[in-house]
Amino acid sequence: YIVMEYLSGPTLQEYEKEHKGKISEKQAEILLEPVINALAYIHSIGIVHCDISPDNLIFNKEGQLKLIDFGAAKNKKKEKEEQYCKGGYTAPEQYLEKEFVGPWSDVYSLCAVWYEMLTGIKVPPAVERLQKDRLKNMTMASEVSEQTNNILKKGLSLEIQKRYFSVLNLSCDIKSNMESKEEITKQYM
């Protein structure tokens, strides 16, 4: 069994509904930071979550998002097993028999959550995107920066080789993006 802290706050899914589906770019980046840190830790000990979605992210009393529900988690060194798939949050390799899941799979799922936080639109399931990549035709919200849009495109790439290999790589680009936005803001103050 797994012992976890008791969390009674709303899930990100409930929070999104309450806030009409869109969260500001800056707020989303701040909210996702502890989730990225949690993923970096579990990946460092050889575990892949495999079920990141807004209903598996819950707020604690301090307003920080916590990653929950490790029921689908896998040891990344194991052979391919039956995968748990949850719509647009599931990486394409989780559907394919020949592919292995890894930290890059959680990167895809996290970016799908982030995309939804910013746009209020769910990413189409990867199996549909493999047929015809509809993500390219979706327009990002006008208040989302080009840099964030590029980070999301890379994180949601259908090809593992074009995606961030780890959440640490993703985190570096997010932090760099946040710092560049702060510099631009300072210039105009």
Regions found by a protein language model. Name each.
Residues I36-I47:
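Protein kinase catalytic-loop region centered on the HRD/HxD motif
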Residues L31-L32:
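Activation segment signature within eukaryotic-like protein kinase domains
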Residues K80-E93:
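Conserved activation segment of eukaryotic-like protein kinases, specifically the C-terminal portion
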Residues E93-W104:
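Conserved end of the kinase activation segment
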Residues Y1-T11:
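Conserved short submotifs of the Hanks-type protein kinase catalytic core
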Residues L12-I23:
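AlphaC helix of the protein kinase catalytic domain
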Residues E143-L158:
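Conserved C-terminal C-lobe helix
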